[in-house]
Amino acid sequence: MRTPRLFGSRKETFDNFKVYETMLAGRPFKVEMGKMCGLSNASALIRYGETCVMCNVVMSPKPREGVDFFPLNVEYEEKLYAAGRIPGSFMRREGRPGERAILTSRVVDRPMRPLFPKEMRNDVCITMTVMSLDPDCSPEIAGMIGASLVTAVSDIPWNGPIGGVQVGLVDGEIVLNPTQEQRKVSDLALTVAATMDKIVMIEAGANEVDEDTMLTAIKTAHVEIKKIIEFINKIV
């Protein structure tokens, strides 16, 4: 009988396993690479607080024939097990993606799609799977940053990276990536995605917020996004 090999540490098991750490809006942000999904073009496990999102990107080896558009597919998957819950249906199975998952996929798609070459016709699939959920650390933002990171690291042609943050307005103060309690009382729900030089996507809802406050919120978001992009560039 073959004796199983014992490893002294996790890093000895995976030669390419690397961990990168930084802070995002005052909370720890960690990237683990080289351990999962080795057949994808690039893969990373994103940890933001207690939130964990697995991000992967895959490109077909050949362009799709007979199409005049770029076949990009962005999927955000949020299963109930991530929150420690069991589906309430009779079969106890996960259903089709909910409205939140579909909207999150679109929020990630919008800033990333224009940065691919216009003539590109290869199928590209970006998948973000929520493994665990911390209500105070947005899985949408972790997924967006992770999608940007894996695409930038991969051999897929792309003019990124991008970064993204959420902005709230609590008691007149601008808050980056507000917690669950802060989101409940916030007068602003703003999501900003940007490159190092330009804002590429804004999604917002507000309770009569004036233009100056909105502009300040966007500028504050871009300052934080630049830090994220610098972090991604160090990994790339």
Show where each model-derived region lies.
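Catalytic cores of large soluble enzymes that bind and process phosphate-bearing ligands
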Residues: Y20-E21, P28, G66, R93-T104, ...
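Short glycine/serine/threonine-rich phosphate/pyrophosphate-binding segments
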Residues: L39, S138-M144, P161
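N-terminal, positively charged regions that mediate nucleic acid binding
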Residues: R2-L72
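A generic local secondary-structure boundary/capping motif
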Residues: V19-Y20, E32-K35, S43-A44, P61-P63, ...
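Mobile "lid/hinge" segments at catalytic clefts and subdomain interfaces of large enzymes
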Residues: D155-V236
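Small-residue-enriched alpha-helical segments and adjacent helix-cap loops
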Residues: P87, M91-R93, L103, V107, ...
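Glycine-rich, flexible beta-strand/loop modules in the N-terminal catalytic cores of phosphate-handling
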Residues: S40-V124, V130-S132, C137, M196, ...
